[in-house]
Amino acid sequence: MKEFQVYLELDRSLQHDFLYPLIFREYIYALAYDHGLNNSILVENLGYDNKSSLLIVKRLITRMYQQKHLILSANDSNKNQFWGYNKNLYSQIISEGFAVSVEIPFSLQLISSLEEAEIVKSYNLRSIHSIFPFFEEKFPYLNYVSDVRIPYPIHLEILVQTLRYWVKDASSFHLLRLFLYEYCNWNSLITPKKWISTFSKSNPRLFLFLYNFYVCEYESILIFLRNKSSYLRLTSSGVLFERIYFYAKIEHRVEVFDKDFPSTLWFFKDPFIHYVRYQGKSILSSKNTPFFMNKWKYYLIHLWQCHFYVWSQPGKIHINQLSEHSFYFLGYFSNVRLNPSVVRSQMLENSFIIENVMKKLDTIIPIIPLIRSLAKAKFCNVLGHPISKPVWADSSDFYIIDRFLRICRNLSHYYNGSSNKKSLYRIKYILRLSCIKTLARKHKSTVRVFLKRLGSKFLEEFFTEEEEILSLILPRASFTLQRLYRGRIWYLDIFYFHQ
């Protein structure tokens, strides 16, 4: 992105924040396809789902200068060829270039805010595991929690009208309406889920931009309501715009993204309410009374209905006590557990027994959803009994073992923060036995004969613990350090969670 910064600044200064002329720039399409100006991707004439070469882009720009090719109508057909390609291909190329250009004002604003705040970029700030230390620090002292699912989709005209406050180019909005008209029925106030699926697959970058902008607008109003509802100003949050190539952290506010599926981790905290969000699910928690939580519940409902014209049922937002309720977030079931302890103190001839109760956040692996996912992937049945993977039986032994080990290590890496590792050991056992059955199926043997031939140490990597790896790296590590790594470990290199 840095190599195109000069071009972006030049166009921005010449066009006075007009984005429409950017679709006539070749480097915009190079950004869209993640390759340089001197490179191209050769494609066959197979339709508009393929990547476009730079030669096609040059032809398209020439045609846009010469005629009104951007005017598409319902009479256009897939059979109408245009220099060997149909018009849907050109529409796809332009929409992806437009998705890049519409991100530029927000990206430039993010860069300037980073420079003003003198924030040092670090990849560790993107980790979604950074939210769990926040949970461990704050949630044991809170009383109530509420799971909130951000309603989506909304009517796309509302999105376009909201964008007009940030981008001054009216031509860009007419072009955006043109692209959206190809995928939905504008006569309906409720966008069907089928249209959302089609739109997200055809142009994921533009879809994610619109969705992230909608969430950003929603959270900006949420912060405004928070400041108006309290005499104490909220100082631990800020408004930044994050796209595919940018991230930032300001005090207690973290934004997280992934190149393939941009998703934002965002939270703020204050003495009254704590807010955490990942993708479309958010958590509201407070130490105050249920009345305070109900007030925020109806704040959100009226905000969605009156500002975004999205209907949300109040019964779907539940308010629960943290001590009696487990909430599901980022692949973990989390709850606050009471940990009683008894301390005996003796002073001269008198002894005292002091009972102390400490609250501790428990993070539990959801074993049933994980087994359901493994059963869907054909690693086991619905009861959790391991089965062979016949699809991989034709591959080499090294490939089969490597695939199983990779899945096992990824799961172990992510769920090493669990309070109880027994569920993780069960998942490892399922994958280990599934791997053995797959190899035995390939060699036309039984599991017992196969293990007897290879020995009992076969596939022991499945049960390799993190402290064993650390002992190889740090052979002189103390016993205290080894005990430390038997506990919960949160990693700062996990950038997204695939559900």
From Swiss-Prot:
GO terms for biological process: mRNA processing; RNA splicing; tRNA processing. It is found in: Plastid, Chloroplast. Pfam families: Intron_maturas2, MatK_N. Keywords: Chloroplast, mRNA processing, Plastid, RNA-binding, tRNA processing. One of its GO terms (molecular function) is RNA binding. The keyword tRNA processing applies. InterPro entries: Domain_X, Maturase_MatK, Maturase_MatK_N. One of its GO terms (cellular component) is chloroplast. Usually encoded in the trnK tRNA gene intron. Probably assists in splicing its own and other chloroplast group II introns. Belongs to the intron maturase 2 family. MatK subfamily. This is Maturase K. The gene is matK.
